[in-house]
Each structure stands twice: as structure tokens, then as C-alpha cells.
């Protein structure tokens, strides 16, 4: 028989059935409180005026009077047993059981109606074989549990127990479930554990470190058949399986959710080390698995304890083509380019990834210097220095700000091509520059504490932008990795807008008078050359003017303007729960508009006509508002946890 208890708030009323009530927060107090709520000694249960004639002393009656007569079966003002049972069985009765009650509660109430004199403390202590105290804010396993002489199962899930005094556990106990508590070490359970315990459940507690493997040996649990240590912070797989090997009766084991279960060879090493194991992490161990990982435990100490993840980012769809909304560039600029990329955060690694990720972070948040010259560079090339270099560059610019004003002296040949020269304004102070920099950094592009930001390559706009990104993360610090997987990773689609301006290099070393004389001399020389060449010079000048609208080769770039187009969380907890792959399409909603798509269609149709002049141009299908269904902004994300499929693969990839 058993009694189950669901989550309810405790009451301050007097407890029953005993005369004394233990302190709140103990197991026995929770049991007594539940029994009190069953009202086993109150109407319609128990003995009272409603059934007293059935329990009057019978010694003074003659033997003829002991035979019940029809009219004397129920005295006036009393209820029959059937009527009382109907009151507790009917759902509409005010004495009906609560919704979260079970069959055991119903049995006890009916017993209290049929034979209320049996409801005593002695009865309860000998009656219960199973106690379930779930989510009752219990903090202490008290010694009153020893009064339950036949107790075999004790379930204390979802409470606040930090330590368990094993001396207070009944020696008859076979099942002890402590799932979802706050136990930080198994040492407290090993003082005087029940010798006949067959199942121990410690899932979702706070077990931490490699020393916990010392407390899962046959010296403490000689008859253990089932062990649940899932979702703790256990780290040393080799030590754990070495200790578990001593449990000869162990058949069911749960270790998933621990950092040690993230290593690629976890399942193979555990299966090969525990030959008698039947079920691991709720998955039956097959003979084929035993064959594939045979011999792996002999080389377990040679395997590196690290987890490997592969992050793949596919296509971006539904991006708004912002360039069609910008005006045509003028000769003096600015020339605007747009790039798009995806960022995600991942937990820090000790060695390899730190150098690369620092460059990625600087690429995202650091503006290019105001005087940097980019000679025929593609828009995808960006600055790769770390953020700390900004302060040094700003200091150098401030020192050179005294020479920032340069007088113009005539028009040069470069001004004919690129338009009027622009005087570059230096920053006035480093504080102002840093203040501007802070404004340019979107807080959504900064990684959360303990993580590093990674980015795909910067790509120009297209209907479908292929990222073709794949990154392998190898991590040795497994405890922070578990915390990261529980939190998930944030995926962001970023639009980068870069404004480029033509650069005019003024001659600083020549005085004004010398420039003027030189200008007249050059003018005369040009006229002489033009006379010798005849009418060829005007044609050349016309070609130069014709190329006036082309962007110059030497440009300076403004700091990139970043805009977050979409941002969302990718849940990674399934990887911790045993799933090898998380694959999703992040949907950030529709960002395109009918106007922008019409402009994009018109621009693309012009390009097609220019390329295929000789061919018959294809008819452009117009976009009507009624049929307009824009594609939402999406990106394909896949994160895979590497897992070894055989002992040979594990030794080849992870042997030190």
C-alpha cells in the first residue's frame, strides 16, 4: 500500500492523527499534514453521533438483543454506512476528495467510515509501505521516519533537501528517490545507508566534481540495481565508470545531463566498462553497441576529456534590399555598400578559438579609422584589430590634429575626376571619439558574459544569401559548457552599411607663391601640348568627364553603421538531454515591403536588359498588392554534438 502527496501549501492547523506534530519542513510533518486534510476523524469519517450506535459497548445486552432488528439497525439521527460512503464518493458532495487525491486517499477515508476504530498511529506506522512527499518544501529527513516499520519506498522529489542523515532512513527501504533537491554531495548518504537499497535517485541535484565517484561503490550500495545521477555537474567520466564497475547488480543507469556525458565517447566507454548494464539513459543497450565499443575501456585513460560541436549556418532569406531606397551617388560621394552576416555566441574556449573570436568581435564593433585608405578593396574586407587599438589610434589622431587645416591652392588633375576636394576633420578629443564609438555599438551585438561572439563572412544582398558557414568548437571546460547549453545561443542577422568618400591628397610642402607660379607654368605647358596634339586633347578631356561618375579608386570609409534585422534564441537543451543534433530555421518575421520589392524588381530588370541586348528580354511579372506574400526573414542554423560510433573512431580522434 502507498500514499502519495501532491504540491500544496502547508496549514498551521492541528495535525492528526497523533497528538504531537513535528516541526514544519520535515518529512513526518508533511505526512501528518496530509493525513489531517483527509479528515479521517471528522464527519462523515470516524466515530460520532452519526454512527455511535454501531460502536456502543455490547456486554450488557442479552444474546437475543444482540441480533439486530430491522427497526433498530439505524437509530434516529444516524446515517447508514452506505449513505456515509456516498458522501465521500460523490463528486458534488462537500465532503468529496480533492482533485489531486489518489486511490490510497479514497481507501483510507472509506476505511475510516467502515471501521474508524482502526485509524490509530500504530495502524499508520505499520500500514504504509510507500511514502510520496512531493513538492512540499521539505528540508529535513527526520528520525520519525524510523517509526514506519514496513516502509520500502520513500519519494521526496522536488523539495529543498540539502543533506540527508542516513541514520534516519528505515533499514527496510528499497527505493529512495531524491530527484530535484539541493544535495551537493553523496557523502551524507554513505554514513549508514540502507543495506537493501535497490534504487537511488539523485537526478537534478547539485552534485559537483570528480570526487563524487568515491560514493558510488559496492561498499556503500551492495544491492543497487538502478542509479539515477542525471543532470548534475559530474565531470570525470573515467573515474565514474571505474567506481560503477564495482556495482555487480547495476542494470539501469542515468548519467545524461552531466558535463561528462558531452564527451563524444561517453556512451561507448560506459557500455564497455559496465558489461552487465541493460539500460543507459533510458535507451536499451544493444548487443551491436557492445560489439562496436569492445575494448574501449582498456584505453579509457588515454582519451582526452573534451566536447566537440559543429555549428553550421546556411542560407539567409527574406532580407530587405535597402540599397534601392538610397539616392544615386554623386561624384563627391558618398558611395554606399551593404553587407549582411549572421552572429551567434558560444562559450569561451581556453586556446584556439580565443584568438579568432577576438578578431571577429573587433570586426563587428570596431569602426575603421577615419584616415584609412582602401585601394580597390572589396567591401567584405574589414579591420581585424582588437578594440583596445582604438584608444591608441584616437590618441595619435589627436596629436596630429594641429595640422588638420590645409589651404587649397588651385585645382589639381585629381579634382577633375573626383570633384571638389573635401577637408578631413580630425576628432577634437579622444573622449568624444570614444563616446561616438559607444553609440555605434549595438548592445544586442555584444556577447553575454562567459561567451564569445562568432560571425559568418560578410555577403552582399541577394534573394538568398548563402552563408556557407561551418565552425568546430572543441571545449575542455565542461561545467560552463553545460550552463551555456541550458541558456541557449542568440542568433542575430546584421546589416552593415558602409559610406565611402573620395580622398584628395593636398600638397603640404609647397608655399602658396610657388604653387601659383607652378600653376601658370603648368597651364602654359598644357596649352602648348594641346596645340601640338590638335583636336585629340578635347576628346581625351571628354572621356575624363564621362568617367566622372565612376567611384574613385582611393576611398576613405566611415565607421560601419550596423543594424540588427532579426535576433532570436536557439534552444540547445536537447543536446544536454541526449539529442545529437539541433536543427532549426530562425524566423524573425517579414521585414520586406511592397515598395522595396518593386524597386528591386525594376533594378534587376534593367540589369537583365543590359546583359542580354541581343536576346529577347523576358517579360517582367508585375507585383500586385493582392498577390503580395513576402518571404519572412529566416536563417538556417544547425548545431551538432559530435559522438563516436565505434571504439576505433574514439581512439583515432581523441587518444592523447
UniProtKB/Swiss-Prot annotation:
Pfam family, one: LRR_8
Coiled coil (residue ranges): none
Bias (Basic and acidic residues) ranges: 517-544
Annotated region (Disordered), positions in chain: 1-25, 512-554
UniProt protein name: Leucine-rich repeat-containing protein 43
LRR repeat segments: 150-170, 172-193, 196-215, 223-244
Keyword Lipoprotein among UniProt keywords: no
PROSITE patterns: LRR
Acidic residues compositional bias, start-end: 1-13
Lineage, uppermost ranks: Eukaryota, Metazoa, Chordata, Craniata, Vertebrata
Keyword Acetylation: no
Residue ranges occupied by any LRRCT domain in the UniProt entry: 258-296
Keywords: Leucine-rich repeat, Repeat
Amino acid at each position: 500500500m502507498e500514499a502519495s502527496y501532491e504540491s500544496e501549501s502547508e496549514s498551521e492547523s492541528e495535525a492528526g492523527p497523533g497528538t504531537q506534530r513535528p516541526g514544519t519542513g520535515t518529512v513526518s510533518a508533511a505526512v501528518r499534514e496530509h493525513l489531517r486534510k483527509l479528515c479521517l476523524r471528522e464527519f462523515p469519517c470516524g466515530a460520532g453521533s452519526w454512527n455511535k450506535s454501531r460502536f456502543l459497548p455490547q456486554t450488557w445486552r442479552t444474546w437475543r438483543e444482540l441480533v439486530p432488528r430491522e427497526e433498530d439497525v439505524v437509530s434516529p439521527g444516524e446515517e447508514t454506512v452506505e449513505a456515509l460512503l456516498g458522501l465521500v464518493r460523490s463528486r458534488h458532495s462537500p465532503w468529496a476528495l480533492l482533485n489531486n487525491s489518489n486511490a490510497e486517499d479514497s481507501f483510507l477515508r472509506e476505511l475510516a467510515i467502515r471501521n474508524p476504530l482502526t485509524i490509530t498511529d500504530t495502524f499508520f506506522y505499520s500500514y504504509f509501505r510507500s511514502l510520496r512527499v512531493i513538492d512540499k518544501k521539505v528540508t529535513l529527513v527526520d528520525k520519525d521516519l524510523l517509526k514506519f516499520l514496513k516502509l520500502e519506498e520513500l519519494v521526496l522529489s522536488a523539495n529543498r533537501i540539502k543533506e540527508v542523515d542516513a541514520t534516519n532512513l528505515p533499514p527496510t527501504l528499497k527505493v529512495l528517490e531524491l530527484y530535484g533537491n539541493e544535495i551537493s554531495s553523496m557523502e551524507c548518504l554513505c554514513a549508514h545507508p540502507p543495506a537493501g537499497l535497490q534504487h537511488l535517485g539523485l537526478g537534478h541535484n547539485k552534485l559537483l566534481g570528480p570526487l563524487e565517484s568515491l560514493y558510488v561503490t559496492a561498499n556503500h550500495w551492495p544491492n543497487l540495481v538502478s542509479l539515477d545521477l542525471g543532470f548534475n555537474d559530474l565531470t570525470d567520466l573515467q573515474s565514474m565508470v571505474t567506481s560503477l564497475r564495482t556495482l555487480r547488480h547495476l542494470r539501469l543507469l542515468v548519467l545524461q545531463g552531466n558535463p561528462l556525458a558531452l564527451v563524444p565517447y561517453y556512451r561507448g566507454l560506459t557500455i564497455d566498462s559496465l558489461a552487465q548494464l541493460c539500460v543507459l539513459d533510458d535507451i536499451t543497450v544493444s548487443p551491436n553497441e557492445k560489439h562496436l565499443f569492445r575494448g574501449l575501456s582498456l584505453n579509457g585513460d588515454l582519451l582526452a576529456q573534451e566536447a566537440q560541436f559543429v555549428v553550421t549556418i546556411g542560407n539567409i532569406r527574406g532580407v530587405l534590399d535597402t540599397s534601392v531606397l538610397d539616392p544615386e551617388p554623386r561624384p563627391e560621394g558618398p558611395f554606399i555598400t551593404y553587407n549582411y552576416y549572421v552572429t551567434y555566441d558560444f562559450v569561451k574556449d581556453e586556446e584556439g578559438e580565443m584568438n579568432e573570436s577576438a578578431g571577429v568581435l573587433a570586426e563587428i564593433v570596431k569602426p575603421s579609422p577615419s584616415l584609412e585608405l582602401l585601394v580597390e578593396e572589396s567591401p567584405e574586407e574589414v579591420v581585424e584589430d582588437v578594440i583596445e587599438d582604438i584608444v591608441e589610434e584616437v590618441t595619435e589622431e589627436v596629436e596630429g590634429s594641429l595640422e588638420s587645416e590645409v589651404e587649397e591652392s588651385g585645382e589639381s588633375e585629381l579634382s577633375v575626376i573626383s570633384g571638389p576636394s573635401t577637408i578631413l576633420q580630425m576628432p577634437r578629443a579622444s573622449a568624444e571619439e570614444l563616446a561616438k564609438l559607444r553609440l555605434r555599438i549595438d548592445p544586442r551585438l555584444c556577447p553575454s558574459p562567459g561567451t564569445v561572439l562568432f560571425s559568418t563572412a560578410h555577403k552582399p544582398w541577394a534573394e538568398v544569401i548563402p552563408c556557407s558557414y561551418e565552425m568546430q568548437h572543441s571545449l575542455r571546460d565542461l561545467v560552463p559548457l553545460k550552463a551555456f547549453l541550458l541558456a541557449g545561443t542568440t542568433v542575430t542577422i546584421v546589416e552593415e552599411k558602409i559610406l565611402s568618400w573620395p580622398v584628395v591628397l593636398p600638397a603640404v610642402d609647397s608655399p602658396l607663391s610657388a604653387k601659383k607660379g607652378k600653376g601658370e607654368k603648368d597651364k602654359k605647358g598644357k596649352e602648348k601640348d594641346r596645340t601640338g596634339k590638335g583636336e585629340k586633347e578635347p576628346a581625351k578631356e571628354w572621356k575624363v568627364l564621362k568617367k566622372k561618375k565612376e567611384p574613385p579608386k582611393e576611398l576613405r570609409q566611415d565607421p560601419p553603421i550596423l543594424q540588427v534585422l532579426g535576433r532570436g534564441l536557439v534552444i540547445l537543451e536537447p543536446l544536454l538531454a541526449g539529442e545529437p543534433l539541433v536543427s532549426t530555421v530562425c524566423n524573425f518575421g517579414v521585414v520586406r515591403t511592397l515598395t522595396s520589392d518593386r524597386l528591386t524588381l525594376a533594378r534587376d530588370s534593367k540589369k537583365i536588359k543590359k546583359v542580354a541586348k541581343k536576346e529577347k528580354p523576358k517579360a517582367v511579372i508585375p507585383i500586385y498588392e493582392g498577390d503580395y506574400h513576402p518571404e519572412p526573414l529566416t536563417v538556417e542554423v544547425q548545431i551538432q554534438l559530435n559522438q563516436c560510433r565505434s571504439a576505433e573512431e574514439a581512439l583515432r580522434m581523441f587518444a592523447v
